[in-house]
Structures are given as C-alpha cells and as structure tokens.
C-alpha cells in the first residue's frame, strides 16, 4: 500500500495545523509519533536542525548550534513538525550543550524506542571554543548495541577542519 490513511495519522495532530503554538519552555510532551511501515528493514532517518538555540545555565546568554539526529526506527517514528516544536522549546531552557544533546536523545528513546539513535551537536564558539557533543544508543541485547559502541569509538576519527561554523 502506498500512502497513509486517516487512521494511520490519527496521532499526528500538529502537522497541517494553522494555529501552531510555539512554547519557549522545554516541552517534551509536544513530540508525536507515527507508525513505521517498513519495520522489516533497517534504515536510517536523519534530521539536520540548523537553528537550535538554548541558554547558558549560568549566564543566560544564548547558545546557537546545529543538531543532527540519526536513528534506525523500529515500530514508531518521530513526526518532523513536532520535533521542530520540541527543539524550539529549548529556546529558554538553560542547560549545557552536553546536557541538551543527552536530553534530546533520552526523550526520543522514551518516545519511539528506536533500534539505534545518535544525536550530535555543533555549537558556535563562545569564548573562542566550540563544543560538539555526541551521544548514541543501541538497543541492549541486539546488534545495535555493538553498533553503538563502534560508532562511539569511531565518531570523531577524522575531525573536520574548523574555520567557520
């Protein structure tokens, strides 16, 4: 079957909504899922989110970065508009870059229980230092657990040239 019927989309409420509300405070409840129609296949889904902002927990100064989310879905998949609104909800959330990346990954694991997921942040420099945190997860007891270990070990073997974000 090609396409999706209304029954398959009943839990997707934000997509197509003309009255979108932007919450400036951390709101994981906004995340929505839909069913993966290809559960018999392993494949990656990647989101590139270049407009992520949050606040420094100490100074309240804004931090800017790009978030990369890659995952291998199982039964559920995250809906992209809800993900956009969720990431937007970090705007007034005060946390360190490393914490934000882990919070995002943990919320997505709780939401959709993927086979594998990795979240990477590329934050613009503050004080002359840029921070690029990376975290990942592979479902325990599966090949994805070993995959997570290998990708973590190799995630930055060939670091990029940092000249301008």
UniProtKB/Swiss-Prot annotation:
Signal peptide: none
Annotated InterPro entries: GTP-CH-I_C/QueF, NADPH_dep_7-cyano-7-deazaG_red, QueF, QueF_type1
Chief localization: cytoplasm
Subcellular location: Cytoplasm
Annotated Pfam families: QueF
Active site: 56, 63
NCBIfam families, per database record: QueF-II
Single biological process term from Gene Ontology: queuosine biosynthetic process
Example of a GO MF term: preQ1 synthase activity
Job description of the protein: Catalyzes the NADPH-dependent reduction of 7-cyano-7-deazaguanine (preQ0) to 7-aminomethyl-7-deazaguanine (preQ1).
Binding site for substrate: 78-80, 97-98
Cited SUPFAM superfamilies: Tetrahydrobiopterin biosynthesis enzymes-like
Reaction catalyzed: 7-aminomethyl-7-carbaguanine + 2 NADP(+) = 7-cyano-7-deazaguanine + 2 NADPH + 3 H(+)
Top-level class of the enzyme under EC nomenclature: oxidoreductase
Organism: Oceanobacillus iheyensis (strain DSM 14371 / CIP 107618 / JCM 11309 / KCTC 3954 / HTE831)
Keyword set includes S-adenosyl-L-methionine: no
Name the UniProt record assigns to this protein: NADPH-dependent 7-cyano-7-deazaguanine reductase
Origin superkingdom: Bacteria
Keywords: Cytoplasm, NADP, Oxidoreductase, Queuosine biosynthesis
EC number, as in UniProt: 1.7.1.13
Record pathway: tRNA modification; tRNA-queuosine biosynthesis
């Amino acid at each position: 079957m090609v396409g999706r019927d209304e029954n398959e989309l009943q839990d997707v409420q934000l997509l197509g909504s003309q009255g979108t509300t932007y919450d400036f405070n951390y709101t994981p409840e906004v995340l929505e899922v839909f069913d993966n129609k290809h559960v018999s296949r392993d494949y990656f889904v990647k989101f590139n989110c270049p407009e992520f902002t949050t606040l420094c927990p100490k100074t309240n100064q804004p931090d800017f970065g790009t978030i990369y989310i890659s995952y291998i879905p199982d039964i559920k998949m995250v809906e992209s508009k809800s993900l956009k609104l969720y990431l937007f909800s970090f705007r007034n959330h005060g946390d360190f870059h490393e914490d934000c990346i882990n919070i995002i990954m943990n919320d997505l694991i709780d939401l959709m229980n993927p086979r594998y997921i990795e979240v990477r942040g590329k934050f613009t420099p503050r004080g002359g230092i840029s921070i690029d945190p990376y975290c990942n997860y592979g479902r325990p007891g599966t090949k994805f657990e070993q995959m997570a270990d290998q990708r973590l070990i190799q995630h930055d073997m060939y670091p990029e040239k940092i000249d301008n974000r």
